[in-house]
Design a protein with these regions (language model features):
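Charge-dense, helix-prone N-terminal extensions
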Residues: 1-122
Length: 122
């Protein structure tokens, strides 16, 4: 069961974060990026998929905040089904965690990773 307007609620928050852009996702839905890095994507009003480093993904799954990815369970990706109003808030929190991790490695001047940011400072 999908939550009415869940994707719009998520989008209205995520696009307020500095540097975040939205694109059509290749498998449907909306993909959010910081530079070239995908922060996650939303499939309609029912599912959010978010990439994390494997260690972080294991913590998130162990805490019951999300499930292993619905198609690629042995990767760093997690899936969160939007079934209850609190799931939208949890999706935003997890997308924010992905954003915070990506932001540490991103330079708006370079639009790329930490090495580029370091080189720009030299």
């Amino acid at each position: 069961m999908a939550l009415k307007d869940a994707s719009m609620q998520i989008q209205s928050i995520v696009l307020e974060w500095p540097g975040v852009t939205a694109y059509p996702h290749r498998f449907g839905g909306v993909e959010y990026r910081l530079g070239a890095r995908e922060l996650g994507h939303v499939h309609g009003d029912y599912l959010v998929d978010i990439p994390f480093p494997t260690r972080v993904r294991e913590e998130i799954v162990a805490a019951g905040l999300a499930e292993p990815h619905h198609i690629l369970p042995d990767t760093g990706w997690v899936s969160l089904y939007l079934r209850a109003p609190g799931d939208v808030e949890r999706a935003v929190e997890l997308l924010r965690r992905s954003f915070d991790l990506a932001r540490r490695k991103w330079s708006p001047a370079q639009g790329q990773g930490a090495k580029d940011a370091e080189n720009a400072m030299e």
